[in-house]
Amino acid sequence: MDKNKTVALLNQDLEGEQAAVIQYLVHAYAMGEGEMACEIEAIAREEMRHFDWLAETIVGLGGTPSIKRGDMRTGGKSVSTWMQNDVLQEKDSITMYEEHIKAIAN
């Protein structure tokens, strides 16, 4: 796969990481103060590290990191619903990463 196609796939991943950061922060802020909100903020920081790694990789390949944000699941009015949405978002991301790894490896 050429660099431009690789960069395009990595930018899709980057957009997903940006969405994950915002989604986790929205959920943490909606929870207010407390241990669970702190845990969710910590997950958002981990997603920021993923974002940073992807952006550096894109630049290293001569590309420009996307400033678009992927889709988010922020609906719902309960912590349980928010957590279910977060898990679904992570599962979707894993599926996309696996597809991109296969595409880049070929």
For the regions a language model picked out, list residue spans one by one.
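Non-heme di-metal
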Residues: M1-N106
